[in-house]
């Protein structure tokens, strides 16, 4: 009897999902909502047609001209083709799945134009589609005067052939283009109504050659295929296996409408541009009786959020309590008036139960999500990522895997105690201490900042709603007020330039401040780069679907940070004191933040702090034994319910 759980290898062998993934990876096609506006020569809309589900394709006609084909939904929808020689792109909101293409009618100046307003695009698919369009435009040969006249007088070309994938030589030719980037607009402007065709060759933004390393491993690609099929799934893996990276890739591959990104903590939610699971659910802490939780969820704003949700992403699932998950499942069915598990919502769940457990009061034993009564009905597929990306040293990887499973041999103890002598800082950058308690973090950072000579430079955040600053404090990795001095130890809390090593968790020291403007800090990072750090923006979603934003420097003081807030980070140089470890998995989370054993210093190591919950060990052991958790511990009724909710293709 199958439990409905499978391994990444099985997922890789599924032909239907492989074919689906192939279709999804075509950068010349895009499926989204499209509003077609026919504009007058003055730029005013004369006619508008809204298509809820349309397909855009890049191709060429029989004259090898670049064309855009718009296919309306349904068998009766007639395709329309637009020449792209004079297209103008408006891409300011591409990161949210929206963009606009303005095309002069038939490429003839003065004949008005057609405007395609794209929305609800999977952001990553939209980015690749626009990138392909820019590249093909950049290397397309421009017609001379005679050939242009011949084309206008000749018959209208009818054939349409999808363009070929971008070739390396096309990237090189595009990168060699020296023209200014005048044809790519950041946002539509009412005054910009000229239909004059741009000069050839079209200018493009600076483009880099793609890396030969695939973006996703085979394991990660298997997870993505399952998600794109509409399958509810839980994917797990040890620290550093790329769970956060994959989750962001998944979110970029799904339509924004109907996709709700959540996490168990505010910081984790902010990393994926979402909200906390509690804020979305709208039932408070979930400790109230089920009837009261349902009443809270039926409030107009909360109820609409549940009704609109088609795909629910939950990150850091290890910190979600079983009873809360069961109540969410019951609320979803009741509010949506559907008997399907979780009210028919596709669940995309990520996390590692061998990391931080749910927070409980007193000595109460935490109940993990996989112990929830509804877990098996709601999560028919579990995939485990096994390839570690954060650490390259196989010895360190093996050590961490042993600690993850609660095993601390004499050799592991010897290696960790030996790190106490490591000199993990250099060039004025000292190791970040990971603390078990947030109070210790605040006291440590405040003490060391006061000890530095010189003036304090304060940087105050700009919040979209100052009255909700406390909400932003809880969900943003940056504080309302950041105080710095010359010599302050800092850490980046956002990726700025991955190729240059300026990534989330990169360590540095303040070496100066600009003399003009706001006096922005100059930071020398451990990777050797000195950079002026400028304001960045964080956006979080709160109860009722409202969005809040905070503008602040992407820095935090880094003499110390808490183990809880370090979850998901990769740190260059780390100092750890595990004397006050109070939860299973806490020591593993702390140790696994380090990129290498050489960048780790462990003080007063005691093997007894390495522990994990036996129930979690059993969960993962049974997962690896066959195709997933055994049904032997479930009663027949629950087992039958599980099988009813299995995908028949598995």
Curated annotation (Swiss-Prot):
Domain of life: Eukaryota
InterPro entries according to UniProt: DNA_helicase_pif1-like_DEAD (IPR010285), P-loop_NTPase (IPR027417), Pif1-like_2B_dom (IPR049163), PIF1_helicase (IPR051055), PIF1_RRM3_pfh1 (IPR048293)
Reactions this protein catalyses: Couples ATP hydrolysis with the unwinding of duplex DNA at the replication fork by translocating in the 5'-3' direction. This creates two antiparallel DNA single strands (ssDNA). The leading ssDNA polymer is the template for DNA polymerase III holoenzyme which synthesizes a continuous strand; ATP + H2O = ADP + phosphate + H(+)
Coiled coil: none
GO biological process, one term: DNA recombination
Enzyme class name: isomerase
Keyword DNA damage applies: yes
Function comment: DNA-dependent ATPase and 5'-3' DNA helicase required for the maintenance of both mitochondrial and nuclear genome stability. Efficiently unwinds G-quadruplex (G4) DNA structures and forked RNA-DNA hybrids. Resolves G4 structures, preventing replication pausing and double-strand breaks (DSBs) at G4 motifs. Involved in the maintenance of telomeric DNA. Inhibits telomere elongation, de novo telomere formation and telomere addition to DSBs via catalytic inhibition of telomerase. Reduces the processivity of telomerase by displacing active telomerase from DNA ends.
DNA-binding region: 586-605
Compartments where found: Nucleus
EC number: 5.6.2.3
UniProt domain comment: The PIF1 N-terminal (PINT) domain enhances the interaction with ssDNA through intrinsic binding activity, it also harbors DNA strand-annealing activity.
Quaternary structure, from the entry: Monomer. Interacts with telomerase.
UniProt region (Disordered), positions on chain: 171-199, 631-650
One of the record's GO cellular component terms: mitochondrion
Family of the protein in this entry: Belongs to the helicase family. PIF1 subfamily.
PINT as annotated region, ranges: 14-192
Residues that hold ATP according to the record: 237-244
Gene knockout outcome: Mice do not exhibit any change in telomere length in thymocytes or plenocytes nor significant change in chromosome gain or rearrangements.
Required cofactor(s): Mg(2+)
Originating gene: Pif1
Gene Ontology molecular function terms on file: 5'-3' DNA helicase activity; ATP binding; ATP hydrolysis activity; G-quadruplex DNA binding; telomerase inhibitor activity
Species of provenance: Mus musculus
Protein name: ATP-dependent DNA helicase PIF1
Keywords for this protein: ATP-binding, DNA damage, DNA recombination, DNA repair, DNA-binding, Helicase, Hydrolase, Isomerase, Mitochondrion, Nucleotide-binding, Nucleus, Phosphoprotein
UniProt modified residues of type Phosphoserine: 40, 164
């Amino acid at each position: 009897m199958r439990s409905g759980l499978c391994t990444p290898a099985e997922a890789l062998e599924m032909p239907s999902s492989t074919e689906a993934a192939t279709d999804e990876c075509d950068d010349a096609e895009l499926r989204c909502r499209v509003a077609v506006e026919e504009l007058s020569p003055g730029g005013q809309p004369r006619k508008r047609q809204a298509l809820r589900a349309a397909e855009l394709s890049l191709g060429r006609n029989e004259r090898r001209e670049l064309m855009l084909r718009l296919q309306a939904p349904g068998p009766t929808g007639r395709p329309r083709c637009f020449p792209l020689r004079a297209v103008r792109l408006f891409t300011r909101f591409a990161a949210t799945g929206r963009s606009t293409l303005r095309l002069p009618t038939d490429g003839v100046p003065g004949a008005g134009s057609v405007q395609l307003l794209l929305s609800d695009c999977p952001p990553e698919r939209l980015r690749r589609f626009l990138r392909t369009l820019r590249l093909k435009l950049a290397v397309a040969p421009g017609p001379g005067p005679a050939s242009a006249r011949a084309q206008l007088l000749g018959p209208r070309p009818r054939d349409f052939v999808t363009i070929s994938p971008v070739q390396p030589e096309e990237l090189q030719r595009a990168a060699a283009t020296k023209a200014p980037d005048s044809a790519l607009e950041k946002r539509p402007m009412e005054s910009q109504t000229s239909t004059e065709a741009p000069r050839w060759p079209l200018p493009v933004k600076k483009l880099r050659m793609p890396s030969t390393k695939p973006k996703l491993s085979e394991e990660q690609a298997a997870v993505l295929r399952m998600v794109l099929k509409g399958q509810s799934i839980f994917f797990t893996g040890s620290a550093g296996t790329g769970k956060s990276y994959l989750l962001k890739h998944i979110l970029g591959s799904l339509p924004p409408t109907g996709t709700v990104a959540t996490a168990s903590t505010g910081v984790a939610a902010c990393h994926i541009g979402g909200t906390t699971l509690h804020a979305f659910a709208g039932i408070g802490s979930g400790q109230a009786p089920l009837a009261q939780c349902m009443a809270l969820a039926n409030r107009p704003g909360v109820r609409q959020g549940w009704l609109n949700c088609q795909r629910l992403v939950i990150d850091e699932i290890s910190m979600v309590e079983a009873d809360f998950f069961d109540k969410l499942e019951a609320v979803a069915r009741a509010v949506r008036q559907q008997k399907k598990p979780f009210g028919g919502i596709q669940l995309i769940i990520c996390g590692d139960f061998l990391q931080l457990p749910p927070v409980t009061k007193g000595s109460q034993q935490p109940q993990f999500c996989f112990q929830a009564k509804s877990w098996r009905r709601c999560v028919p597929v579990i995939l485990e990522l096994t390839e570690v990306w954060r650490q390259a040293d196989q010895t360190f990887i093996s050590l961490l895997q042993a600690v993850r499973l609660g095993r601390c041999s004499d050799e592991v103890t010897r290696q960790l105690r030996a790190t106490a002598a490591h000199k993990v800082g250099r060039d004025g950058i000292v190791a970040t201490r990971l603390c078990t308690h947030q109070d210790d973090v605040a006291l440590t950072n405040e003490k060391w900042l006061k000890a530095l000579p010189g003036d304090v430079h304060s940087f105050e955040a700009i919040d979209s709603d100052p009255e909700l600053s406390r909400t932003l404090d809880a969900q943003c990795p940056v504080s309302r007020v950041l105080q710095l001095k010359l010599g302050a130890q800092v850490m980046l809390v956002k990726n700025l330039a991955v190729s240059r090593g300026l990534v989330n968790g990169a360590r540095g020291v303040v070496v100066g401040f600009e003399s003009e403007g706001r006096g922005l800090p100059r930071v020398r990072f451990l990777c050797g780069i000195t950079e002026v750090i400028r304001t960045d923006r964080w956006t979080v979603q709160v109860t009722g679907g409202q969005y809040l934003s905070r503008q602040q420097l992407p820095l935090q003081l880094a003499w110390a940070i808490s183990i809880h807030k370090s979850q998901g980070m990769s740190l260059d140089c780390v100092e750890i004191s595990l004397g006050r470890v109070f939860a299973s998995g806490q020591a593993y989370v702390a140790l696994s933040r380090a990129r290498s054993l050489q960048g780790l210093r462990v003080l007063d190591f005691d093997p007894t702090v390495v522990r994990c919950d036996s129930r979690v060990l059993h969960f993962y052991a049974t997962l690896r034994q066959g195709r997933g958790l055994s049904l032997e511990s479930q009663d027949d009724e629950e087992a039958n319910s599980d099988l009813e909710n299995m995908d028949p293709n598995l």
